[in-house]
Design a protein with these regions (language model features):
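Hydrophobic h-region of N-terminal signal peptides that target proteins for export
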Residues: 8-17
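Aromatic- and carboxylate-lined catalytic core of secreted/periplasmic carbohydrate-active enzymes
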Residues: 19, 263, 271-274, 287-431, ...
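Active-site mouth of glycoside hydrolases
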Residues: 22, 27-242
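Extracellular glycoside hydrolase catalytic/binding regions
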Residues: 165, 172, 178-316, 321-333
Length: 464
């Protein structure tokens, strides 16, 4: 049976076009960042487009990808076997991924544009042509969990090898998991087999990670797993920085501190327009400020990049489609929500400074008395990052509250300080000060619920 399945799959694995070839991605030798194969920094700015393959037609997919490319996204996260009944509800062209939903053999027909996988090929090609990598989930977690499981280790290995061969030359990252906890040895056997199949199929061309359930990280389940190249977290859909150590954003920091090191990022943070903590009647829906806080909290705690999400876009919600958890608008209307634009601008900030030597720096923030003021708690948590060679430091102030910073981490006697406005991507109020000792800073909107980033650059760097 295994050989028969494998023969069918490998014969059908025609391979996606290599047009728009992107450089391969690799882990930086020091273990905390990703880079391209020629050694350039890679900033992961992802978008959760979970239902992209399943729900959009080609024209809609191009519209979506054009928008994300314009805003500076470098990754879109999409699922081959989608959560929202992806094995029984066809895609926009009436095609299903498998001929039999209980038998995971891809349904492939000869000729172009004749099956589900031709549509996936098209979207992957169009993403790559726009400089966007696809973080491809072979399956949502629903399809390897308990009652809905359709895989055995043998069929998972065959499916993985087929996918690996088909997308070997494409610009992508494999994402295992799919929003579910890894709880049993049987589940682990399926995922191990799927990963091994992917590796055989693509020859090790692509990195692999694991998208966990809410509030967890891949390190919780796969901390020492040899096929995990970098860790992914789902810090989830609440808007606070928890006081409990090791939870959510502190979990990002804990993952950064693991040895041997592996890069870490938040692959599913709080979404824009999402019910806060899944409680819309009590807590309402998130706004762009909530999205910015998650971005800077994760990045300043050691993440190598970040994923954006919008509650209408992950499900590709449109009129006439059943809504999941009260989306506020259609996916088309959500494309230009402020949070997505603001994170695209913030990406430029991180790429404008030395990249591979940036480290978390909670120690440079001088705690107040009481510490609940600074570094603070809840939505008002201050965080910091710095260059380990003293070229720069940054402090994220989520509110207009004065705070103190120890600038002895800066390598030159004088430094340039300025405020970065995360709403506009602009800097203001730049000045030169002495680096030595502790300095107090007052954000431009003191006393207001507006966030700012303090920028500190060594005098030798002096960016315009």
């Amino acid at each position: 049976m295994t050989r028969a399945i494998l023969a069918v799959l490998l014969c059908a694995s025609l391979g996606a076009s290599a047009e728009g070839v992107l450089p391969r991605l690799a882990v930086h030798p020091e273990g905390h960042y990703l880079m391209t194969e020629d050694g350039k920094p890679f900033f992961w700015l992802g978008d959760t487009a979970w239902e992209l393959f399943h729900r959009l037609n080609r024209e809609e997919a191009v519209r979506y990808l054009d928008n994300r490319a314009k805003l500076g996204f470098t990754v879109v996260q999409a699922v081959c076997l989608a959560e929202l009944d992806g094995l029984s509800v066809p895609n926009a062209y009436g095609h299903l991924p498998f001929g039999n939903p209980k038998d995971p053999v891809p349904a492939v027909r000869e000729g172009a544009d004749n099956d589900y996988w031709d549509h996936v090929d098209f979207i992957v090609r169009e993403a790559n042509r726009r400089g966007i990598y696809v973080a491809m989930l072979p399956t949502w977690g629903r399809w390897w969990k308990k009652a809905d499981n359709v895989f055995t280790p043998d069929s998972a290995a065959a499916y993985g090898e087929w996918l690996g061969r088909r997308y070997r030359e494409s610009g992508l990252v494999w994402v295992m998991g799919g929003d579910r906890p890894l709880e049993t040895s049987a589940e682990r056997a399926v995922l191990d087999a799927l990963a091994a199949g992917l590796r055989r199929g693509d020859g090790g061309a692509h990195l692999i990670t694991f998208h966990p359930n809410g509030g967890a990280g891949s390190s919780q389940y796969l901390g020492d797993c040899p096929w995990i190249d970098f860790h992914m977290r789902q810090n989830g859909h609440d808007i606070d920085y928890p006081a409990d150590p090791g939870v959510r954003y502190d979990g990002t920091l804990a993952d950064w501190r693991r040895t041997p090191p592996k890069p870490v990022l938040d692959g599913e943070p709080v979404y824009e327009g999402h019910p806060v903590a899944f409680q819309p009647d009590r807590l309402g829906h998130t706004v762009a400020a909530d999205i910015r806080r998650a971005f800077f909290w994760d990045l300043f705690n050691g993440a190598f990049g970040h994923t954006y999400g919008h509650h209408s876009i992950w499900q590709m919600y449109d009129k006439g489609r059943g809504p999941v958890n009260r989306p506020l608008m259609t996916w088309k209307e959500a494309l230009d929500e402020p949070g997505s634009r603001q994170l695209g601008l913030a990406k430029r900030l991180f790429l404008s400074r030395p990249f591979f030597t940036r480290v978390p720096a909670p120690e440079i923030i001088v705690p107040s008395d009481p510490a609940s003021l600074v570094p603070g708690t809840g939505t008002r948590r201050f965080t910091a990052t710095r260059d380990r060679e003293g070229a720069f430091a940054m402090v994220y102030a989520p509110v207009g509250r004065r705070f103190k910073v120890d600038l002895s981490c800066i390598r030159t006697p004088r430094c340039r300080v300025a405020w970065y406005d995360p709403r506009t991507g602009e800097e203001r109020d730049a000045r030169i000060i002495e680096s030595a000792g502790v300095h107090e800073f007052v954000p431009p909107s003191e006393g207001e619920l507006l966030d700012w980033v303090l920028l500190v650059d060594a005098e030798a760097l002096l960016l315009p």
